[in-house]
């Protein structure tokens, strides 16, 4: 027992730095630090310091003990507490890293699954094209083979009847016939069964030689299409190289924004598309986040003065938003970042704020958290608050929902809302009543839960399916209340009845990539907007019931005869990319509107002779004589029209001319003598010198024109001048006395 106690005592007396040496000294220069002989040796930390041996340092040991008690011990306690805090933070940070790693792996799998799907779709599409081509060639081969076999069967019957050669029979018949001719006895000529058979075979032979099977087969032979599949190795290499840039690793700062905001607004599709938050530095040194084309400047207490003195349209807050009550001018748009930890009692967000975006905030929302002046609310990725009735006030008209974490229930969304936007990643089941019946407009991105009948309420009249939308649209998913449908680059194939017959207007946005076979667009559709489609239009893609077609900027399809069906009456054309040809516009079209940016040559016949009304915007190709057919009776020159109107450009068939704010000066003969009615509309800004309005004009309508009239601006051959309320110029003194003035 004594020996073990000695071992413990000896171990306790050992130097921590040099375990083989005993503690012998106290260093007087280092707050009585205990030392061994090695500590004080030439290479030791305390070499040259003043020391006392432990045995002769009673007073120093008392000082050491007191310092241990009063100073060192409390610091040890504090150190232990700090270490626990640090350990907790370390574990929490590591837990977040593990969680982020799981998210990263899930994202990796999901993204590459999409890439694999895309490649699979491409492979299937190529296989389908190969199969289609083979099927067409099989059909050609079958037709040729069947035709030839049928002919050969008949020919073989003729040539080899009863195992006797036809030529032998013919020779025999000729011999017999010659004998009968010598006998010169036609009346006694006997037609036996062999002769009848030869006559029949002769008929069959003539029919075979007369039919066009051989010619048809030669034609069919040329229809064979032997395709060779080629891959563009340069493009493949570019794709391979581009894969290296599809991802990046970025460090997440402590105050990072941990959610994404999707901007799916298409403009037209516009074309829209998903914008992640971007943390930026502006010219005024404040950090900002870009959301939906707004820069949300992140409030910092260290720079409060700049926020108090400057005006900000959009502000973002990390911890609290108390400064809002101090600002001389409220921002219209407010963003509460993830981690925001202030209880939003009434008035914290003052009235006057119009748009409120909320991330993963930490305090519960209550009634009056959101002021009544807010008209747009966005609940973004990670939002984790219960939305009971009244949380979203009735003043809100538009609601954007990302991947929120709490389940929506009936009354989560107030019935006063008119617009709901379901952003990419939204992951809630939409059972009946979740989207209330007051909603009129619904945008849907790449949501993760399947739509079912009654997901969309019967009050919705406009639906926009954004790029990435990936739901099967079986009959009834889009309710019959919907009248207007916008479709972007959706991922599931449209089928007959995907679009209800009640839809009257469809917009096919840029990137739309579906084959439009007959019946996909239902016969109830009257108006069709078409952007830059990825699949070729074919005859019957557009049903005959459509009366108005609008070809938007970027439209890139060849308009051969029949693509635009004969039911169309009104055609709008913007900056399309394929050349118009004769018959591109069907003869049923009576009104053509060439909008700003239209950039096609209008040679004779492009606009067919059935067109009666023509509107011209800021078109880019010069008009020439015969660009406008002689059948047109009404022309409107829209704002921005920038063409010189020399004699003959507007044909003599025109009776009525509307003129907006055009950019080129009118000259004598710009307006033909056949025009009887001229309307100078709001914004018209051209000088009207004598003769500009020809003497054949009988009615002149004047709106808010910008140029002063002068004497002889208005010819005395007019019957009536109609002056509209919007007109601000002095008109009356320039109207000839014989012309009647009518105020409208």
Curated annotation (Swiss-Prot):
It comes from the Eukaryota. FNIP repeats lie at residues 340-376, 383-422, 426-462, 469-508, 512-550, 555-594, 598-635, 641-678, 684-723. It holds the Pfam family zf-B_box. CDD domains: Bbox2_TRIM23_C-IX_rpt2 (cd19774). Signal peptide: none annotated. GO terms for molecular function: zinc ion binding. Keywords: Repeat. This is FNIP repeat-containing protein cigB. The lineage of its organism: Eukaryota, Amoebozoa, Evosea, Eumycetozoa, Dictyostelia.
């Amino acid at each position: 027992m004594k020996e073990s106690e000695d071992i413990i005592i000896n171990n306790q007396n050992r130097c921590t730095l040099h375990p083989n040496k005993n503690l012998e000294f106290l260093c007087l220069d280092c707050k009585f630090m205990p030392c061994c002989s090695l500590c004080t040796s030439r290479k030791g930390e305390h070499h040259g310091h003043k020391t006392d041996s432990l045995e002769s340092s009673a007073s120093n040991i008392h000082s050491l003990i007191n310092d241990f008690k009063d100073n060192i011990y409390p610091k040890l306690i504090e150190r232990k507490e700090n270490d626990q805090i640090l350990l907790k933070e370390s574990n929490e940070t590591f837990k977040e890293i593990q969680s982020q790693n799981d998210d990263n792996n899930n994202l990796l799998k999901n993204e590459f699954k999409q890439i694999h799907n895309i490649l699979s779709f491409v492979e299937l599409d190529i296989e389908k094209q190969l199969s289609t081509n083979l099927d067409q060639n099989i059909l050609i081969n079958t037709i040729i083979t069947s035709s030839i076999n049928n002919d050969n069967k008949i020919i073989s019957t003729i040539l080899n009847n009863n195992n006797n050669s036809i030529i032998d029979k013919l020779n025999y018949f000729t011999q017999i016939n010659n004998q009968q001719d010598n006998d010169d006895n036609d009346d006694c000529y006997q037609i036996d069964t062999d002769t009848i058979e030869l006559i029949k075979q002769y008929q069959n032979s003539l029919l075979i030689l007369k039919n066009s099977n051989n010619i048809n087969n030669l034609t069919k032979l040329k229809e064979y299409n032997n395709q060779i599949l080629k891959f563009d190795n340069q493009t493949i290499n570019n794709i391979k190289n581009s894969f290296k840039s599809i991802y990046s690793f970025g460090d997440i700062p402590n105050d990072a924004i941990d959610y994404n905001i999707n901007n799916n607004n298409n403009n037209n599709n516009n074309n829209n598309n998903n914008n992640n938050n971007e943390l930026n530095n502006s010219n005024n040194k404040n950090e900002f986040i870009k959301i939906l084309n707004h820069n949300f400047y992140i409030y910092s207490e260290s720079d409060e003065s700049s926020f108090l003195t400057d005006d900000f349209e959009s502000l973002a807050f990390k911890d609290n938003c108390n400064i809002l009550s101090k600002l001389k001018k409220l921002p219209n748009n407010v963003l509460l970042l993830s981690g925001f930890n202030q209880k939003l009692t009434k008035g914290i967000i003052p009235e006057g704020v119009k748009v409120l975006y909320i991330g993963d905030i930490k305090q519960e929302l209550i009634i009056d958290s959101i002021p009544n002046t807010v008209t747009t609310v966005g609940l973004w990725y990670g939002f984790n608050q219960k939305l009971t009735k009244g949380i979203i006030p009735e003043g809100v008209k538009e609601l954007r929902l990302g991947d929120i974490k709490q389940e929506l229930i009936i009354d989560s969304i107030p019935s006063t809302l008119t617009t709901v936007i379901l952003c990419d990643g939204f992951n809630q089941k939409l059972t009946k009543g979740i989207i209330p019946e007051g909603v009129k407009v619904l945008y849907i991105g790449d949501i993760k839960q399947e739509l079912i009948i009654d997901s969309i309420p019967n009050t919705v009249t406009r639906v926009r399916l954004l790029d990435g939308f990936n739901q099967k649209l079986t009959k009834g998913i889009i309710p019959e209340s919907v009248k207007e449908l916008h479709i972007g680059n959706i991922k599931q194939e449209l089928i007959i009845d995907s679009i209800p017959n009640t839809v009257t207007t469809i917009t096919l946005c840029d990137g739309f990539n579906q084959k439009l076979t007959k019946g996909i667009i239902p016969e109830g559709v009257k108006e069709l907007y078409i952007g830059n489609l990825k699949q070729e239009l074919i005859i019957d893609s557009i049903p005959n019931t459509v009366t108005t077609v609008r070809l938007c900027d970027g439209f890139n399809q060849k308009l051969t005869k029949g693509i635009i069906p004969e039911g169309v009456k009104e055609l709008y054309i913007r900056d399309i990319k394929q050349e118009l040809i004769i018959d591109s516009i069907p003869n049923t079209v009576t009104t053509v509107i060439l909008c700003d940016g239209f950039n096609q040559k209008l040679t004779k016949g492009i606009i067919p002779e059935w067109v009666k009304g023509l509107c011209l915007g800021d078109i880019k190709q010069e008009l020439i004589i015969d660009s406008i057919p002689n059948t047109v009776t009404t022309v409107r020159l829209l704002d921005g029209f920038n063409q010189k109107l020399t004699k003959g450009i507007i044909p003599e068939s025109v009776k009525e001319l509307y003129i907006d704010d055009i950019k080129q000066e009118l000259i004598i003969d710009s307006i033909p003598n056949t025009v009887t009615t001229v309307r100078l509309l709001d914004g018209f800004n051209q000088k009207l010198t004598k003769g500009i309005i020809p003497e054949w004009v009988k009615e002149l309508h004047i709106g808010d024109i910008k140029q002063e009239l002068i004497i002889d601006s208005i010819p005395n051959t007019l019957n009536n001048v109609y002056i509209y309320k919007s007109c601000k110029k002095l008109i009356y003194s320039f109207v000839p006395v014989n012309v009647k003035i009518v105020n409208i």
